[in-house]
């Protein structure tokens, strides 16, 4: 239950997609800003209030031309004391994306375990600032928070661990040659 707490998540209209439903399932209210063709600085700057919990950013290429750059979003959000969460579920490879978004200032970044990592389908990584990772842990198993019903099995955790190790050991020159 998010009543009485900040529970609005700002989403750039050009990045609004069906996966936003996961935010609503956790109790968030989405505040969609700008329009599908363009999100302007003043759209973002004027969207923060006492109910704002986070900004959700989706760095997918086909959204990029209508969105503000992540560094700009981070700068504005942090000026308001609001964290930025990046949905990078499908942003691997390149391997550098594992740290790119946090290097650009994002507070949390989520990656799918079941896409390019080739881990279990119902797994993923949450990377970012310790304080936010600890908050995530507070709501998952063995606690009885909102994420309890989506807890990862031991098998999924080990499978994801092995998948990440294999991903990190991959020779990406071969993959890049295939993509060229």
What is the meaning of each model-derived region?
Residues 1-168, 172:
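Conserved PLP-enzyme active-site core in the AAT-like
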Residues 174-176:
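Active-site capping/gating regions of soluble enzymes
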Residues 178-180:
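Mixed-charge interfacial surface used for oligomerization/domain docking
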């Amino acid at each position: 239950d998010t009543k009485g707490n900040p529970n609005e998540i700002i989403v750039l209209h050009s990045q609004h997609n069906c996966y936003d439903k996961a935010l609503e399932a956790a109790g968030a209210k989405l505040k969609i800003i700008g329009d599908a063709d363009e999100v302007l600085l003043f759209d973002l700057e004027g969207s923060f209030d006492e109910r704002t919990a986070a900004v959700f950013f989706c760095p997918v290429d086909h959204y990029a031309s209508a969105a503000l750059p992540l560094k700009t979003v981070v700068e504005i959000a942090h000026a308001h004391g609001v964290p930025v969460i990046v949905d990078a579920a499908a942003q691997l490879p390149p391997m550098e994306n594992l740290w790119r978004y946090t290097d650009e200032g994002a507070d949390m970044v989520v990656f799918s375990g079941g896409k390019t990592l080739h881990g279990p389908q119902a797994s993923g990584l949450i990377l970012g600032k310790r304080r936010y990772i600890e908050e995530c842990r507070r709501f998952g198993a063995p606690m009885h928070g909102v994420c309890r019903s989506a807890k990862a099995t031991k098998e999924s955790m080990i499978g994801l661990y092995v998948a990440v190790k294999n991903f990190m050991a991959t020779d990406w020159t071969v993959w890049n040659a295939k993509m060229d």
